[in-house]
Regions:
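The canonical Cys-X-X-Cys-His
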Residues: 60-63
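Flexible, acidic/Gly-rich N-terminal and inter-domain linker regions that tether
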Residues: 1-54, 58
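Conserved Radical SAM active-site core
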Residues: 29-31, 37-40, 47, 52, ...
């Protein structure tokens, strides 16, 4: 079993190197400030955006919806695009788009798909999404 997992990991690494090289890029959402000898965050470089505002149906013990209060709200696709335009003008290189969970654990991102595509294509921002638990 362990040998099988190791082989799968080795194959995954090989595919990764073939497609992306050996460079690993890390993006750090900006909802909290931190500084190390290698990196310090800036509030505008990689902001976090919530498509549900402060709403979360689950209120899980690890967060209780508090993380949502650190995120910028964008409740419609148009709001999301306008917010990303503003963030780009302020120096953002990308953003994390997520939100509170629905009762099934999903984040309602479907209706934002076209706007997210526009943010990537027209604004050139790197976009990460967190789709739920």
């Amino acid at each position: 079993m362990a040998d099988e997992k190791l082989l799968k990991m080795e194959e995954a690494r090989k595919v990764s190197v073939e497609n992306f090289g050996k460079i690993i890029r890390f993006y750090a959402p900006s909802f909290t400030y931190y500084k190390t000898s290698f990196y310090s965050s800036t509030p505008s470089a990689f902001p976090t955006i919530s498509v549900t505002g402060s709403y979360c149906a689950l209120k899980c013990e690890h967060c209780n919806g508090i993380v949502l209060n650190t995120m910028l709200p964008a409740l419609t696709p148009a709001e999301l695009f306008r917010l990303c335009e503003k963030l780009k003008m302020e120096g953002a290189v990308g953003c994390l788009i997520s939100g509170g969970c629905m009762p099934d654990g999903s984040v309602p991102l479907g209706r934002f798909a076209e706007a997210i595509g526009l943010v990537k294509r027209e604004l050139g921002l790197t976009v990460f999404v967190h789709t739920g638990i």
